[in-house]
């Protein structure tokens, strides 16, 4: 998922540029300057959050650590590893949401980000300690750290999902304001919703040691419903190129859903299936 956020941003930006270049005007009420400024800040915070969450917890790295800790017998020696780097400015931004969110939402965001940062730090610290126990051949203590890291990996996944869920309604409201005059408003919003749902599915599937099948199935049902609604949106005259990209996106979402269903039939995580799903997701938003 290294480039997926950039691809998604490029797709939406293309739609936005096209919508500003002409076409029919909606008759939506004119938003106030304050509403537009708040909506802009919400989208900025959302985009920053996407970048932080992508860099903060790389699911394949987390699973690689767990894979190493799960090995029995003699294992190849490793040195201590550092967690993935995160831009300090962006971390500070997500920990200090502005008053474009209400007080309760700000508290929830700070609480979940603080929990995520703490869980990640403990996860990698535990791995470093695990390596030191291996050198001392203290298998019992090493095993205890594996159990702890199983829990921390799940916590990180939950915190990420919580942030997505908290931001989703605010992002949708902000889009309603900023895209009020865009003839491609509904298409842009449907792309964002489906992309967010696909991210959630990947996040849930990546839980190597504890696949949450029922939640994945619910998200797949949600994505299928979103796709069905997106297919019913009428074509926008004068924006043939953008509509072609939109239809391509919908086709790739269909492929993604089929790939998830195939992976779910196996009932367990595999790196190959995770790569397959990630590839299908990235292809959908190129």
Predicted regions and their residues:
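Bacterial N-terminal signal peptides that target proteins for export
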Residues: 1-8
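C-terminal motif of bacterial Sec signal peptides marking the signal peptidase cleavage site
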Residues: 16-19
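Bacterial signal peptide processing site
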Residues: 21-24
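N-terminal Sec/ER secretory leader and immediately downstream segment
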Residues: 37-145
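Secondary-structure edge/capping motif, primarily at the C-terminal ends of alpha-helices
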Residues: 53-67, 98-104, 127-138, 174, ...
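Polar/charged, Q/E/K-enriched amphipathic alpha-helical segments with strong coiled-coil propensity
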Residues: 124-154, 263-278
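Extended amphipathic alpha-helical interaction segments
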Residues: 142, 146-247
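A cross-kingdom marker for long, charged
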Residues: 221-286
